[in-house]
């Protein structure tokens, strides 16, 4: 079978709350690590989320 173009990634909160989102990204077009600002419900504010591996 062929390797899939989209991979699942885990977006970890940089606030240190342990909260994370799981999303998909295209591994061919987005080769660098993903960072995005999203809402952290534990910290109750928008923080930066950085890409990490799904364990």
Curated annotation (Swiss-Prot):
The keyword Ribosomal protein is assigned to this record: yes
Alphabetic keyword roster: Ribonucleoprotein, Ribosomal protein
GO terms of molecular function: structural constituent of ribosome
KW Ribonucleoprotein (keyword) present: yes
Record-level GO BP terms: translation
GO cellular component assignments: cytosolic large ribosomal subunit
InterPro entries, per database record: Ribosomal_bL33 (IPR001705), Ribosomal_bL33_CS (IPR018264), Ribosomal_bL33_sf (IPR038584), Ribosomal_zn-bd (IPR011332)
Family: Belongs to the bacterial ribosomal protein bL33 family.
Protein name per UniProt: Large ribosomal subunit protein bL33
